[in-house]
Design a protein with these regions (language model features):
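Predominantly flavin-linked oxidoreductase catalytic cores and closely associated redox partners
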Residues: 122-233, 254
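Short, Lys/Arg-enriched N-terminal segments with co-localized hydrophobic residues
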Residues: 18-29
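N-terminal FAD cofactor-binding segment of flavoenzymes
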Residues: 47-52, 56-91
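Short beta-strand to alpha-helix junction loop
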Residues: 94-113
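Methionine residue identity
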Residues: 1-3
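N-terminal Rossmann-like FAD-binding beta1-loop-alpha1 element of flavoenzymes
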Residues: 31-54
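A conserved FAD-binding loop/helix module that cradles the flavin
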Residues: 240-267
Length: 268
């Protein structure tokens, strides 16, 4: 059963903590737990599903919602590697100077469906309560949702793509940093995004956005770094806010795929 064993040592340094993490995991028949229902989590899960059993834990009812990422792809042909033509049609792609605009909520819905069809276990409305190092694995204890799912999982590898919420009273996963590998990205800053009708864009009074992404459904996303700098006279159809990389080049489907690939290679 065990064909080969790799010992991975990861060293993290922060202003408050310096520790080393030694994890031994199987190349095949691995049990992998991924914390956080992000696009990164889904891409990681589909990779590790080929090597064993993968479970994703997400506190919210649906992965990737509410949306907090621009609907943007630079090379739309990359979607062919993941989605059917019918699924791609739902994305409502349209070319812009800043890249191709797309409906990010459907990127997440489709990717969730694809991951589940490949055998990834996805547990929404599920919070990690504790972790414990056993002799040959890490035991993860979770809450139970209405599906009467298991609440105990044994893992060889735990990856966290979860970002701590800044909302007061928001439930959080309880993680042991010594037992998890964080999917670390670049330093994040606040971003604000708003959606308005393309026929109303651009407004003369609107400050220049960092990203402007029109879609073929007649709607346009505008994104700024920081807080909302402007509200259209009729208001936004939808607003998004969250923390993202300060680099616009990092904010695309293509860039996320590349970062996940780099992360996987760093563990091999």
């Amino acid at each position: 059963m065990l064909m080969k064993q790799i010992v991975l040592i990861v060293v993290f340094v922060s202003p408050h903590v310096l520790f080393s993490l030694s994890i031994s995991f199987q190349v095949i028949n691995m049990n992998v737990c991924i914390i956080g229902g992000t696009l990164e989590a889904l891409l990681l899960a589909m990779h590790y599903q080929e090597k064993g059993t993968v479970s994703i834990f997400e506190i919210d009812a649906e992965l990737g919602l509410p949306i907090s990422h621009p609907g943007r792809v630079l090379n739309p042909s990359i979607f062919n590697e993941y989605f059917s033509p019918q699924q791609i049609e739902f994305l409502k792609l349209s070319s812009n100077p800043d890249g191709w605009g797309c409906r990010w909520e459907w990127v997440m819905k489709h990717m969730t469906s694809v991951a589940a069809s490949k055998g990834v276990n996805i547990y929404p409305r599920t919070r990690v309560l504790s972790m414990e190092q056993l002799h040959d694995c890490i035991r993860v204890i979770t809450t139970n949702n209405e599906r009467h799912q298991p609440t105990q999982f044994d893992a060889d590898l735990i990856i966290s793509t979860h970002e701590e919420s800044t909302k007061p009273g928001r439930l959080q996963h309880v993680l042991d940093e010594s037992l998890t590998i964080p999917f670390k990205e670049q330093e994040h800053i606040p971003w604000f995004g708003g959606t308005l009708l393309t026929l109303h864009h651009p407004y003369p009074s609107m400050p220049k956005p960092a990203l402007t992404l029109s879609r073929s459904d007649g709607q346009t996303e505008v994104w700024w770094k920081g807080e909302c700098p402007w509200i259209p006279p009729a208001g936004y159809l939808e607003t998004c806010s969250g923390t993202l990389s300060s680099l616009v080049d990092d904010l695309s489907f293509d860039a996320i795929v590349q970062r996940v690939s780099d992360f996987i290679h760093s563990l091999e």
